[in-house]
Regions:
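Solvent-exposed alpha-helices and their adjacent loops that cap or buttress functional pockets
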Residues: 12, 28-30, 81, 137
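Canonical Radical SAM [4Fe-4S] cluster-binding loop centered on the CxxxCxxC motif
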Residues: 14-15, 21-65
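Short, well-ordered coil loops that connect the C-terminus of an alpha-helix to the N-terminus
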Residues: 44, 48, 83, 162, ...
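Conserved AdoMet/S-adenosylmethionine-binding subsite of the radical SAM
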Residues: 71-79, 83-86, 91, 95-222, ...
Length: 269
């Protein structure tokens, strides 16, 4: 009861988050044109990460910003969003700052803004205490972009340094509550493109009842320079992006083209 009263008294506009950066005209992280907020902090160490500068939750690597401040910046671009665009929060791993997410999306929804969460879901916990906050977040979230790095747990540890148990649990939970989801898988030659694993991932996604879109994201090297700047060895040096044939193979094995519900949704922002 006391906790509920405290939550009710919070001025969401003054809630702060560690923001790494923003992008004004995102065109690939959700429907339409979107304002992207990249939050600081991530516990994964994906070998192909293009934002390794977002890993550490250190003040000197980010800006401490209020919800009102972020929204004020976002609203400058609202005229470009049309009826499909809105705000996407990514990272780093956005769920590490779930209180900021709840505050930002709550205020955004009051303004009629479409809210998308881009997450790998590693922080997810299927416990009553965590779900209380997660459900509160989902109540003001229109769409989740869920990154599934690898279906094979041992290979997932190699790719990210972490297990995928919480990620798959989150996928199932989102299915249970009927939250619209786009599944995303980064295709890295020799790392995340093994046929057997792709088939298993396709089977897993088929068990979910809420998948509007299933995206294959071909590996690219645009973030490699950041690893060099940070003095971190880049394990994928020399690895080329997947060929068109390998991308086509992955799409066919996982039947990604069968997920078309995203084309039927129109969002009013």
């Amino acid at each position: 009861m006391v906790e509920e009263k405290i939550e009710e008294a919070v001025d969401y506009g003054k809630v702060t988050g560690m923001v790494h950066s923003t992008e004004s005209f995102g065109a690939v992280d959700g429907p339409g044109i979107r304002f992207i907020v990249f939050l600081q902090g991530c516990h994964m160490r994906c070998q192909y990460c293009h934002n390794p500068d977002t890993w550490e939750m250190e003040p000197n690597k980010s800006q401490l910003r209020t919800v009102d401040d972020v929204l004020q910046e976002a609203l400058r671009y609202k005229g470009f969003w049309g009826n499909k665009g809105g705000i996407t929060v990514s990272g780093g791993e956005a769920l590490l700052q779930i209180d900021f997410l709840i505050a930002l999306f709550t205020k955004a929804k009051e303004l009629g803004i479409h809210c998308t969460l881009d997450t790998c879901a590693l922080p997810f916990r299927n416990t009553p205490r965590y779900l209380k906050k997660f459900d509160k977040l989902m109540a003001v979230t229109d769409l989740v972009l869920l990154d599934i790095k690898e279906i094979n747990e041992e290979q997932h540890k190699i790719v990210t340094s972490q297990t995928n148990k919480n990620i798959l649990a989150c996928a199932k939970y989102l299915s249970d509550i009927g939250k619209p989801v786009w599944i995303r898988h980064v295709l890295v030659p020799g790392l995340t493109d093994r046929d057997d694993d792709l088939i298993e991932l396709g089977k897993f996604v088929k068990t979910l009842k809420n998948v509007d879109k299933f995206e294959i994201l071909p590996y690219h090297t645009m973030g490699e320079f950041k690893w060099r700047e940070l003095g971190i060895p880049y394990k994928l040096e020399g690895v080329k992006p997947p060929t068109a044939d390998r991308v086509k193979n992955a799409k066919e094995l996982m039947q990604t083209e069968s997920y078309t519900e995203y084309m039927n949704r129109v969002h009013n922002s």
